[in-house]
């Protein structure tokens, strides 16, 4: 099991849907979150893309020297950059970070935003172009280790003599992550990506996705890893966690929710449609209605696009729910919480000790070098929680 955190390059706050409780998200703050994730033992951080975010590649590059082991899951969008240029960017980043790059292929699901970037392909065409993009990207980087060039002719993209002179550290290329809920997305994932990501749906729905991608991958003689993108609201007690969930959306008003849902309805993303269905396009608002599966809460999706669900509960409950997903085949958890700095610490302190031994063994610290807590009475080193 791998646990990732999230860099809030689109903003951060104590509440959703309001400027109240918001904080300045600048390089200094993003560095705080990244360094926290690095020192706490998260495998890496997801850095999102889109017009609502800071540029992920520039943000990630700025954080290389501030971190030691943290991996960067950086989004790339086909159509905004040539696949060969994206390959050179990835190779350079991987070399400068000494092999810490992961690439998140993002097709995009908002036709309005895509048109603003000069992309006018429909849903099916975007996935065709994305498949060609990532094939050129992968094969160009793989060829770079042998000093070879690539020729490729596709419907949307073609290259002749594509070459990367300085290969990435990772062979044959940095791992590729990708998420999507449509049939076209599953087909692309099965044929070309290393890890398929899903947004946080109830376990039965996630199991169906995993089974479908696995079947498709087997036809290509491939195996694919699986990850899930979730928010987390964990507190020392169940009641406190649900109170925190209520507080997170306590500033929302009907107009804000309605405007957000209207924007989501204009998207052609199958995943976004599935997220919206979990709360009936903003109609469901009570805790009972938003708890769509035990401890899985759809309140975040009332106003947030993309990942719209959170695991809510005490540490043991949240860890148990994660194990349920792991039993389905999920081995990568990409998590976040509001505000992201404090919640990175809270989740690590409360839940990491309850995760499988393989996760705990990778965490910083040991009996000799901490963490200990404050020394007691000038000479007693705390070892375990007080009973």
Curated annotation (Swiss-Prot):
Entry keyword set: Flavoprotein, FMN, Monooxygenase, Oxidoreductase
Gene Ontology biological-process annotations: alkanesulfonate catabolic process
Enzyme kind, highest EC tier: oxidoreductase
Database matches in CDD domains: Alkanesulfonate_monoxygenase
Alphabetical list of InterPro entries matching this protein: Alkanesulphonate_mOase_FMN-dep (IPR019911), Luciferase-like_dom (IPR011251), Luciferase-like_sf (IPR036661), SsuD_RutA_monooxygenase (IPR050172)
GO function term, MF aspect, one: alkanesulfonate monooxygenase activity
Reactions listed under catalytic activity: an alkanesulfonate + FMNH2 + O2 = an aldehyde + FMN + sulfite + H2O + 2 H(+)
EC number: 1.14.14.5
Role played: Catalyzes the desulfonation of aliphatic sulfonates.
Similarity field: Belongs to the SsuD family.
Record PANTHER family: ALKANESULFONATE MONOOXYGENASE, ALKANESULFONATE MONOOXYGENASE-RELATED
Full protein name: Alkanesulfonate monooxygenase
Organism the protein comes from: Ralstonia nicotianae (strain ATCC BAA-1114 / GMI1000) (Ralstonia solanacearum)
């Amino acid at each position: 099991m791998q646990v990732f955190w999230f860099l809030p390059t689109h903003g951060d706050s104590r509440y959703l849907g309001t400027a109240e409780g918001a904080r300045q998200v600048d390089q200094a703050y993003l560095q705080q979150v990244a360094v926290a994730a690095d020192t706490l033992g998260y495998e890496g951080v997801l850095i999102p893309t889109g017009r609502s975010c800071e540029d992920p590649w520039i943000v990630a590059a700025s954080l290389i020297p501030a971190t030691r082991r943290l991996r960067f899951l950086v989004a790339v969008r086909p159509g905004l950059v040539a696949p060969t240029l994206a390959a050179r960017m990835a190779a350079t980043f991987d070399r400068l970070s000494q092999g810490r790059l992961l690439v998140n292929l993002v097709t995009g699901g908002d036709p309005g935003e895509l048109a603003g970037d000069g992309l006018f392909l429909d849903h099916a065409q975007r996935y065709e172009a994305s498949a060609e993009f990532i094939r050129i990207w992968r094969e160009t980087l793989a060829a770079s280790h042998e000093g070879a060039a690539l020729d490729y002719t596709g419907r949307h993209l073609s290259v002749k003599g594509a070459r990367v002179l300085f290969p990435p550290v990772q062979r044959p290329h940095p791992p590729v992550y990708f998420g999507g809920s449509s049939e076209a997305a599953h087909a692309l994932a099965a044929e070309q990506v290393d890890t398929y990501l899903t947004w946080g749906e109830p376990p039965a729905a996630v199991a169906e996705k995993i089974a479908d991608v696995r079947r498709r991958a087997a036809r290509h003689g491939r195996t694919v890893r699986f990850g899930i993108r979730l928010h987390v609201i964990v507190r020392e007690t169940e009641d406190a966690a649900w109170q925190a969930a209520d507080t997170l959306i306590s500033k929302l008003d009907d107009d804000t929710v309605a405007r957000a849902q209207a924007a989501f309805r204009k998207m052609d993303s199958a995943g976004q449609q599935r997220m919206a269905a979990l709360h009936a396009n903003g109609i469901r608002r009570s805790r009972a209605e938003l708890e769509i599966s035990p401890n899985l809460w759809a309140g975040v999706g009332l106003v947030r696009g993309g990942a719209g669900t959170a695991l809510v509960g005490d540490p043991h409950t949240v860890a148990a729910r994660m194990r349920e997903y792991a039993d389905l085949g999920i081995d990568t958890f990409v998590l976040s919480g509001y505000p992201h700095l404090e919640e990175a610490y809270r989740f690590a302190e409360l839940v990491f000790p309850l995760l499988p031994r393989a996760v705990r063994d990778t965490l910083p610290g040991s009996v000799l070098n901490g963490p200990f807590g404050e020394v007691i009475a000038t000479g007693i080193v705390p070892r375990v929680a007080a009973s």
